[in-house]
Amino acid sequence: MLFSRSGHSIFPLLPPYAAHAPTTNQGHIITMPPDGLTPYLGLRARLSQVWINRWTILLLLVLVRVLMAASGLQADMGTAKREALSACSSVESMGSSMASMPHYLSQGVNELTASGVETAVSGLKSMLMLTVTGVEELVLFIIKVLYQTYLCLFTLAVRGSVHVAVGVIKDAADFLNSTVKEVGDDIGKVVSTFEDGFNKFLDSVNSVASVFGGSVPTLDLNSSISTLENLQLPSSIDKGLDKLNNSLPTFDEVNNFTQTVLRTPFEEVKKLVNQSLGTYTFDRSLLPIPAKEQLKFCEGNDGIDSFFDNVGDLVMTARKIFIAVLILAAVLACIPMAWQEIRRWRSMKERSQLVRKEAHDPMDIVYIVSRPYTAAAGIKAASRFSNSRRQILVRWAIAYATTPAALFVLCLGIAGLFSCLCQYLLLHAVEKTVPELSTQVGAFADKVVDKLENASAAWANDANGVIGHMNQDLNQNVFGWVNTSTTALNDTLNTFVDKTTGVLNETFGGTILYEPLMDVFGCLIGLKVAGIQKGLTWVHDHAHIDFPLLPNDTFSRGAAASIASNNSDASDSFLADAGDQTSNKITEVVIRVVDKVEEGIRMETIISTAILLLWVFIALVGIVRALTLFWMRDRSRGEGGGAPSTSHHTSDAGGFDDVPLTAIPNPSAHSAPAPRYEATISTVVASRAIPTSNSFQHQDEKMGFAGERQYGSALKVDGAPDLRGSAYVEYGVEKH
């Protein structure tokens, strides 16, 4: 497109610029129409549309999205409230069932307890019978071993001694009997001879005595000698030893006595055990059955209602805050945008003067005027390079990444992420209130557990009372007999010792064997009996039974453990279903809503990030393309580069010059090299751009001739020198 001359307008209904200008202005470009009207927007018109700047609109769109999210969250919370109240009713019903569990479980537990007691008592009976029989036979065996051993010992000692003594006495008696008779015979013979002589002597004496009237007695020893001849040791001299030998005790009486006395208490115990425990049956009616429980914690409890009301108030407060903040931000965004618009307007006015100057690339001038900020950013970034080609490539890459379409994508992605941030803040505020609901529901669970604990404790106390009474009864009626039997057995052992001692005393009392036999008895039997009595005393002291008592938390332990703070698995709670994320169904409803909103925010964040990455991709495309050409050198005409720029200055009679607004060079034009920018504005000399036909034309047009143009005669501002020695022009900035 070319600026037409003043006499011919391309829009018939609109007068051309300078239509009212005097003839003295012919040959010069008039920047403003005489009446001040322009077809483009002035500063005030531009400022009138500041309120619809992109950031205000984006903030308003973010506000709309946040309000939609808040409304959706309120609707979801309303649904969650209804579901929570329904779940509360379910929890209440389930809690009542849980609290009534002792009523149903106690029957089975009572039967289990009674069966366990009956089985234990039956086993106790068998154990007692076997134990009593075993102890009975063991005691009898030990006592029999003891006294039979003792009997063998002193029978050997006593009978051996008696046999020796009786033999000695018999030999002595036979020797004395035979010797005394022979002595008597010999004495009788001697005495008979002596008596005959003596009698003869007496006869002589008697004859003389008769003269005097008397007589002398005669000597007669026959009777005495006859007695001496018939003298023998009495046969009763060994009758005592024979009697002692024949009267040695065999302890048959002791054995019979001991058998009778020892077996009696054992047999009595067996009889009593059979009578008492033969068909033992536990009285199940003594075990209690707790009553049913009916819990009411949903009616009259505003915990759930207050929670959701608080959440609703929180959402409404958040909506008001977002409305106030975002609207204020949208309004405040108009201030910098207005200032930016003013600066843009001033920059456009300043840079519009470049159009009237001789420019190497009019399209660059149009770009700088129409996009002052992005062009300024490109110029500032390009100023770091001294090579004109690289400066142009840097500016081109920035221009590629900051096109209106690219900036729209960038702003859309940023606005989406900001919207997600606002929604996240709203969701985070709601999430912080969830523990309050968990506390309310935890109170429900505590009520259920308290009911269970009370019912379980009452049942356990009553059941333990029955078990304790049974323990006392068994200890008195069964183990009381054991204690009695051990006492009787100790008494029997004492009687056994006394009876044995009496027999020994009767048999060997007053003899030299008594003391040794008593010492042997004490060593062999007395010490063993004392040991048995010590064992029986221990049995007497420890013979009792204690059945284990039922714990108070029999029915409540599992429920209490499921809601304990150290339970890491939330689904273990009796208020939750398997696989739930929380410990109760009421909180699960709220968590489900939060997860739904969170998933939506996550999806929007992903979409916004994808849009932002799309802009990054666009920017990378420009950067990669610029880098591709960055290290390529300028091509000369012989290598396919463009022809040197020439000028062909023409002017019509009206004093207007055709200023080409295309970036395509015209190598056939006859134009002089572009002069430096001058401070005064007099004329505009331009070259008509006619496309060239070369193999790089299409590529150059796509890239804006980046790296393919001849910038040796690039524009300089008002003839100021370039500090880096670059032929590249920096518009609006002078280098000093």
UniProtKB/Swiss-Prot annotation:
This is Plasma membrane fusion protein prm1. It comes from Aspergillus clavatus (strain ATCC 1007 / CBS 513.65 / DSM 816 / NCTC 3887 / NRRL 1 / QM 1276 / 107). Residues 638-675 are annotated as: Disordered. Belongs to the PRM1 family. InterPro entries: PRM1 (IPR026777). Its main location: membrane. The keyword Transferase does not apply. Residues 1-54, 159-320, 419-603 are extracellular. The gene is prm1. The keyword Transferase does not apply. One of its GO terms (biological process) is plasma membrane fusion involved in cytogamy. Glycans are attached at N177, N222, N245, N256, N274, N454, N483, N490, N505, N552, N566. It comes from the Eukaryota. It is a multi-pass membrane protein. Residues 76-137, 342-397, 625-736 are cytoplasmic.
